[in-house]
Amino acid sequence: MTEPTQPQAAVAADENQIVAERRDKLRALRDQGIAYPNDFQPTHHAAGLQTEYADADKEALDAKALDVAVAGRMMLKRVMGKASFATVQDGSGQIQFFVTPADVGAETYDAFKKWDLGDIVAARGVLFRTNKGELSVKCTELRLLAKALRPLPDKFHGLADQETRYRQRYVDLIVTPETRATFRARTKAIASIRKFMSDADFMEVETPMLHPIPGGAAAKPFVTHHNALDMQMFLRIAPELYLKRLIVGGFERVFEINRNFRNEGVSPRHNPEFTMMEFYAAYTDYRWLMDFTERLIRQAAVDALGTATIRYQGRELDLAKPFHRLTITQAIQKYAPNYTDGQLSDDAFLRGELKRLGVDVTQPAFLNAGIGALQLALFEETAEAQLWEPTFIVDYPIEVSPLARESDTVAGITERFELFVTGREIANGFSELNDPEDQAARFRKQVEQKDAGDEEAMFFDADYIRALEYGMPPTGGCGIGIDRLVMLLTDSPTIRDVLLFPHLRRED
């Protein structure tokens, strides 16, 4: 039978008592003038020692007599009379300290017995293996570097409340190895992407985060004010138009990994600020982009995880296999096979079906929607969530692709794709529209939609049109959601799990 938990008030009272006791200990350290020393430099890290000497037996280590200096957070402590043990965790892993009064002195040993879990400690000593086979540091010098005033969560239960894990990520990182592994994998994936891009002769650039005109995506921006210039500014929703200005300027391959901001809802797939990579390559098209993106994602998985075969939410996913490619209508008919070609070309039927599925077709975005936009909406309701294996959905309608090049063979269709994996969009790319007159006409259409109430429609960017008028070579461009990619690679069900500090409501 499960024991009843303490009332929250009692837990808070206990924690307050612990904090008060630890403050008393800190006060004593201050009185001695040794509260927060900063003169210790580690020579080794726990993981490095564990790896290098994993196969060394007790006799070999005794013969080597390796001197080490290690520092970290004390996670466990066992005081056993004339010999004590502490498990210390640094940024790489854990190692055991072996402490005796004979080695560190009676005064230091007595002080050590009063130290608390969570304290930052340091030791110099000799690496050895205990009789039970545990690789350890036999401490000859032991110091307290930083006093932890707040207690760590119970080691068996950790941070049980999910929101507390997000809000106090610093504690989550201390006590949850899986969280640390997630963010190490994220770093490896991004490093892999950067190397992949560099090896393909792309130049990494930085473009503005504050825009005078929001553009490059259909989204609602955050608005701010520049006091010195007395002008309204927008946090960027996408870097696209600036990156394509660089293509005009002669940089033929560019990419940027940075934050975008969208003043929209929070969900398992959405955070108001998020990390994207956008890249643009002159003299390429959307077919080249799909091949390139597929290779990039596969390599990121291998570099981050050591394999292209991953597991996500209990299901295996082989990123080494060729990614699927389907048109919007092919995807609908694959996952909702009852729809006929005639129905998918019938405006009234599509509107009725969307309404039946719970879509509000009276909202501004649908008022003048054509067949293509209605098909896309139906795809989102019937097929998108079922695209488990990597799938490029291609040939998006021109009315929802204001920056993409129109197909040379099919009227009303653009050379655009979106990549879906596990039912989520991971990437969006297309052959870029480089005709300034066509682009200006599409911007004007977007302005009409905005005036009709569509808050996500684009503004008219006159300077971008001016840039295109200087001539932009045929170009392909793609954006990859880094956060969603990391969710996939780390088996994380929500975007908050892969953001160090996700957005949350104000704390009460």
Curated annotation (Swiss-Prot):
EC number: 6.1.1.6
Cellular component annotations (GO), alphabetically ordered: cytosol
Note on cofactor: Binds 3 Mg(2+) ions per subunit.
Binding site for Mg(2+) 2: 425
PROSITE patterns named in the record: AA_TRNA_LIGASE_II
Residues the record lists as binding Mg(2+) 1: 418, 425
Tree of life domain: Bacteria
GO biological process: lysyl-tRNA aminoacylation
NCBIfam families with a match to the protein in the record: lysS_bact, PRK00484.1
Official protein name in the record: Lysine--tRNA ligase
Organism expressing this protein natively: Burkholderia pseudomallei (strain 668)
Gene responsible for this protein: lysS
